[in-house]
Amino acid sequence: MFVLPGYDAFLGFLLIAAAVPVLALITNAVLAPRSRQGERRLTYESGMEPVGGAWIQFNIRYYMFALVFVIFDVETVFLYPWAVAFHRLGLLAFIEALVFIAILVVALAYAWRKGALEWS
């Protein structure tokens, strides 16, 4: 008997959420073909023979653009539900959203000032 009534569905969800990745890893370990050591590190190029090496260094600029993109992409994910339920939430939710946007504007100004948005 479960101690917290009403949480059976949540416990079931947690068990399934923990079991799916474990089962995926076990299935991969059992069913994946074993490759020889030399071919294991080769780049896959759609069944063609690899041309050149794939181990190159990327410029740090790509990392900075990706980081800024992820930050503002997450902002969009957080603001969309707020915009959908704007009429029902009231003044406090509006003020909270303004504070959230202000923090992101400060972060954007900081990134701009540090040169994270410049390509040259």
From Swiss-Prot:
Class of this enzyme: translocase
InterPro entries named among the record's database cross-references: NAD(P)H_OxRDtase_bac/plastid, NADH_UbQ/plastoQ_OxRdtase_su3, NDAH_ubi_oxred_su3_sf
Key words of the record: Membrane, NAD, NADP, Plastoquinone, Quinone, Thylakoid, Translocase, Transmembrane, Transmembrane helix, Transport
Membrane topology: Multi-pass membrane protein
Molecular-function GO terms, alphabetical: NADH dehydrogenase (ubiquinone) activity; quinone binding
Catalytic function, reaction form: a plastoquinone + NADH + (n+1) H(+)(in) = a plastoquinol + NAD(+) + n H(+)(out); a plastoquinone + NADPH + (n+1) H(+)(in) = a plastoquinol + NADP(+) + n H(+)(out)
Localization, UniProt: Cellular thylakoid membrane
The keyword DNA damage is assigned to this record: no
EC number(s) reported in the record: 7.1.1.-
One annotated GO biological process: photosynthesis, light reaction
GO cellular component: NADH dehydrogenase complex; plasma membrane-derived thylakoid membrane
Record-linked Pfam families: Oxidored_q4
Physiological role: NDH-1 shuttles electrons from an unknown electron donor, via FMN and iron-sulfur (Fe-S) centers, to quinones in the respiratory and/or the photosynthetic chain. The immediate electron acceptor for the enzyme in this species is believed to be plastoquinone. Couples the redox reaction to proton translocation, and thus conserves the redox energy in a proton gradient. Cyanobacterial NDH-1 also plays a role in inorganic carbon-concentration.
Description of how the protein assembles with itself and partners: NDH-1 can be composed of about 15 different subunits; different subcomplexes with different compositions have been identified which probably have different functions.
Family statement: Belongs to the complex I subunit 3 family.
HAMAP family: NDH1_NuoA
Protein name, UniProt field: NAD(P)H-quinone oxidoreductase subunit 3
